[in-house]
Amino acid sequence: MDIINRGIAFVALFLSVSAFAAFEDDLPYLKSKWRSDVTDKSTGLGVEELKVKAEKIAAAGKGVKPWCLVKAEIFKMICEEMSVGFSPHDAFPAFSCWSKKNRVLTKLINERIAEVDSTYCPDAKVKSKEVKGSILRHDYDHAVPDWDRILKLGFPGIKAEIDASKATNDYSKAMRIVADAMLNNVKRLVKIAEDSKEANNPVIKAEIVALKNLAKAPPKTAYEVMLFQLLFFYYGEHLDHLQVRSLGNWDRLLKPYYEADLKSGRTTREEFKNLVKHFWWQWGSLDNWWGQPVYIGGTKADGTTEYNEVSRIVLEVVDEVHVPTPKLQMKIAPNTPDDILSKALDMARRHRSIVFCGEEPMAKAMAAMGFSAEEARTLDIWGCYEFQPRAAANTTLPCIINMPRIMVDLLEKARIGELKAATFEDFEKEFHRELERRLEISLDVVRAYEANMDEFIPALVHSLSIKSCVDEGKNAIGNGMKYNLSVILQAGSGTAVDALAAVKEIVYERKEMTLAELGQVMADDWKGHDELRLRMRASRRKWGNNEPLTNKLKRDLYRVFGAAVNGKANSRGGKFFASGHSIDFFYIMGRHTKATPDGRMKGEEFSKNISPAPGADREGPTALVASINAINTRDIPGDIILDMMIHPSTIQGEKGLMAMKVLIDRYFAAGGCAMHFNVFSAEELRDAQEHPERYENLQVRMCGWNVRWNDLSKKLQDAYILRAEGVLQP
């Protein structure tokens, strides 16, 4: 009891204004923490030394022990031997394995994948090449822990539960090794902190007390919750090599701890907010390209909102620290408090990293996938804006279909005389048939890849957070969940639709050239046809303008896509679903795809997600939402995302906020699940390109994450400027 009382005293001291210098004084350390090795080298090994030891363990175990046990032993070694560090400028420890691009296990896992493929599915890679321009991959790097459960257990409870499990297979043995290693690492952190030169610093003292408490019990204070989350994240993502793709429903999770801290006098609102800033900066410093997801909001079982005072503090912190990551996702419903929605929308128009996710349309999409209303109410948002039943599902994203490449290949066949289409309807049917063929091949390849996930990615830390996996000794990222989902993504559906409309106009309506001749123009990248290219690029007959032809083409395209994918069995006891998500493949694939008849040149980016192509939506946001209303979003239940670019002059002041609310309401009513904003003028972006030193903090929404403008290549910057030039102005 005495240690708990002393811990409370120290935590109170830690949270007091006197324990920290001004937050700005801590920033230099916080910014550098996860971008260089700030650990005390006398405490252990750096990442390169750990890699050498890991490779020796792997070599010794090869052919002798199951991979899950070898991986667990490597995890244990890292926990015991990596160097760590503590700073008076930070509430959280540092570790030597800090880089996402240089994790200890990366090389070993890639080698393991190659070995598993050559053993179990040697033909899959060859077969995947038939899906030209698309990407078929081993996608395993997504996990959402059951935060509710493990916050109640703590590290000792996690260990006790796996020790008590009746499962006796190799996987459960590996989980026991990892549970022991995590708990022992917490104890090791205590000893290193106590032995450090800074041990008497108030901040380090508070950290020692919190770590001691976590070594004996579940978190009891808001600070201990944050420390637990950071440690569990680190163990899973950096040591066990599986991305933790959400910190959970953060305001709901933190609320009881924050309120207990307030009631006991351990903290004040401002002191808690200061601590949240330090927590936020852990990921601000990591600064990985796609960001660390966290979400707030939701609806309770009684229909009232989950938003609370922690939600408001989170918004204030996101606004004030202004870093691209963590990226904030917000559940939006009719019960969302107006002050919270207004604050968030105002932040979005000032370039903060927020995505708005509609509870009602997500519930409809979940229903289309066969999930219950309760599973929809409590769903986790993860990744960019994906969603799944909380603590009951895993999701892979193993395939990204390149839709414009189908157009390129059909026109090439026409050019060499292998394709004839007397009518546009014949050509569209051929496009759909080819899409179906590529999807059928893709699903077969994915089944082969995913059938052996346990052999290369035993997700040991994540599995410890899932009750059924602990009880049954199963892999949470393989087939160990209630729902094991495989979602098929697409890139460039808007570009493909615009290209179809262009083929109809050029070949079948205006009869300016034959299909074969158009194929030659595309092969030549529009050379000698600049006038036609500019006309097609400027055409209003493009997806996103509420234009009847492109609305129908998009609806038919998604119908074919969904019918070929949704509900089909995968190889993990689950199902496939189609998604409107493209991640960043809209420009990755665009770089390697030849010209398309919509005016796009070779190498230019595609449309992303369900959005229009750059510069295509010239009729304004209302027309864009009307276009979305014209499709059946249930055809792509895996995710329905819109990237909305708006001219800043159209959403100024209170009327501007109201316009944004109306836009979101209409989009959600149309079945869209997630929306994010880029609020820029072309003039501002051109000035930022010319004078980067004036815009060091300018952020743009890339896809499901924010990036700093100055970190983009000129080609990507030019694409944003092109899109901004087409935005409707007053």
Cite the ranges covered by each PLM segment.
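Conserved catalytic cores of very large enzyme subunits
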Residues: 22-175, 198, 202-210, 217-730
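Amphipathic alpha-helices that form helix-helix packing interfaces
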Residues: 158, 182, 186-189, 503
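Heptad-repeat amphipathic alpha-helical coiled-coil interaction surface used
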Residues: 183, 190, 194-197, 205-208, ...
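Bacterial N-terminal signal peptides
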Residues: 9-18
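Sec-dependent signal peptide recognition
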Residues: 2-10
